[in-house]
């Protein structure tokens, strides 16, 4: 038995837009899971744990649905960076990141309630940051965009000006890896076209 009900356990507009771009119109049901209770220092494990907790919080509401949870963090020199809490932190973060290379980790979880199966995966994309001035950093932070994103930048917005290049999956940096999603759906015996609207 298969479902065509795709639930996104995230309030992220970027993740929703990515899914819509490939023909999936998800039911958006943000998780209220408290991320602060997880104390994991390895970024790949952290994003998988958080993505799974988010999906598991939402899954019981959709007994015949396919629930996707995601979480992203940026790691530079092994230090994990999530969303900055305020403008001062975003400025300090950019002063640290400029001219550096970071790894953007996104945990992906699919819970198929009909098949009683859960898949947990992580995708990593390398991000090369431009060496930008303090003035540019302050102007970028003033847009508000860095306060909404893991790593304090949005590849799909103003932040794209300050990324020299990426190595790996482009959509992963925006919020979820579309190629990995397709592979996970296939592993659950779905075709991505099953969810096209």
UniProtKB/Swiss-Prot annotation:
Does this entry carry the keyword Cytoplasm?
Answer: yes
Cofactors per UniProt? Answer: a divalent metal cation
Listed under catalytic activity are: a ribonucleoside 5'-triphosphate + H2O = a ribonucleoside 5'-phosphate + diphosphate + H(+); a 2'-deoxyribonucleoside 5'-triphosphate + H2O = a 2'-deoxyribonucleoside 5'-phosphate + diphosphate + H(+)
One example GO MF annotation = nucleoside triphosphate diphosphatase activity
User: What broad class of enzyme is this?
Assistant: hydrolase
- Tell me which UniProt keywords the record has, alphabetically: Cytoplasm, Hydrolase, Nucleotide metabolism
Gene3D superfamilies recorded for this chain? 3.90.950.10
Tell me where in or outside the cell this protein is found. Cytoplasm
For this record, an example GO cellular component is: cytoplasm
Signal sequence region: none
Note the superkingdom of the native organism: Bacteria
Coiled coil spans: none
Enzyme nomenclature, EC number: 3.6.1.9
Catalytic center at which residues? 71 (proton acceptor)
UniProt keyword Cytoplasm, yes or no? yes
Disulfide-bonded cysteines = none
Q: Name one Pfam family in it.
A: Maf
Q: Which GO terms describe its biological process?
A: nucleotide metabolic process
Listed InterPro entries: ITPase-like_fam, Maf-like
Function as written in the Swiss-Prot or TrEMBL entry? Nucleoside triphosphate pyrophosphatase. May have a dual role in cell division arrest and in preventing the incorporation of modified nucleotides into cellular nucleic acids.
In terms of HAMAP family, this protein maps to: Maf
Q: What family is reported? A: Belongs to the Maf family.
Q: Which PANTHER family match?
A: BIFUNCTIONAL DTTP/UTP PYROPHOSPHATASE/METHYLTRANSFERASE PROTEIN-RELATED (PTHR43213), BIFUNCTIONAL DTTP_UTP PYROPHOSPHATASE_METHYLTRANSFERASE PROTEIN-RELATED (PTHR43213:SF5)
Q: What is this protein called?
A: Nucleoside triphosphate pyrophosphatase
